[in-house]
Regions:
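Intrinsically disordered, metal-sensing/regulatory segments
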Residues: 1-247
Length: 247
């Protein structure tokens, strides 16, 4: 049992690194100016459906099994924790979109966006590690959900830093900082395994928030039927994976 847990913890750390690399790659697209906007939109759409399905079909039910009805309080707390940072401290920005100088003229805006996204990415890591502490299956489906929005996260923060006149190096460093926050979430959760009954439902609330209020609205702004189909494909992929692999 201990050996199996050690293997799952190692898998969480390894996939946390992969997720962090996704943040860095998103920032690289902005700095290089060869960003595939439509490609990012497809990631957002697929990720929105997939994340919502994982939250409601996997994370929240597992949280209830771990902590009973009290888990729902922590789901709600995770949801509104991100809402607090995004809508109280951070200025308005579009997730996965390029930000221009006239929209982000003050360095406080840059810091606020950075803080909000770091909260996101920290809980990305918490979610990955919490999932693997429960089972390899749960950790894997959560990792996929996290990875699908890593490019847009890195893209967004690097774009904000460039719009604030911080230069390419700082933009890449900001994207790297998001990746580091993800790794920190993985490591802290792996070390504090006794707090799993709180960490998993909190990450469930954050996952629900990111999918429902960050990703889906961006998809709905685009009059593109392909994006709507991809949202449903994201949901369907979780159901198919459950049917084929989840014993």
């Amino acid at each position: 049992m201990e050996q199996e847990l050690a293997i799952r913890t190692s898998m969480a750390a390894g996939l946390g690194l992969v997720a962090a690399a996704g943040n860095l790659l998103g920032g690289y697209f902005v700095v290089r100016k060869d960003w595939p906007r439509q490609f990012l939109q497809y990631f957002l759409a697929l990720g929105a459906g997939y994340m919502l399905a994982v939250a409601f079909l996997e994370i929240i039910p597992e949280s209830l099994a771990l902590a009973g009805r009290n888990a729902l309080f922590y789901v709600l707390a995770g949801f509104f924790l991100v809402h607090l940072f995004e809508h109280t401290l951070a200025p308005h920005f579009h997730f996965g979109e390029e930000t221009h100088a006239e929209e982000m003229s003050h360095h406080r805006a840059q810091s606020s966006v950075m803080l909000g996204l770091i909260i996101h990415t920290f809980f990305d890591g918490v979610a990955i590690a919490s999932g693997f502490l429960v089972s390899t299956w749960l950790g894997t489906v959560i990792f996929i959900a996290v990875f699908l929005h890593k490019l847009p996260e890195g893209f967004t923060v690097a774009s904000v830093f460039l719009a604030c006149g911080r230069g390419r190096k700082k933009a890449i460093q900001a994207a790297a900082a998001l990746g580091a926050a993800t790794l920190l979430g993985v490591l802290l959760t792996s070390v504090l395994q006794s707090q799993l009954r709180y960490a998993l439902p909190l990450s469930g609330g954050v996952t629900t928030y990111v999918a429902a209020t960050d990703l889906l609205p961006e998809v709905n702004r685009e009059p593109n039927w392909r994006l709507a189909v991809l949202v449903f494909l994201g949901v369907a992929s979780v159901l198919i994976m459950q049917h084929l692999f989840h014993v």
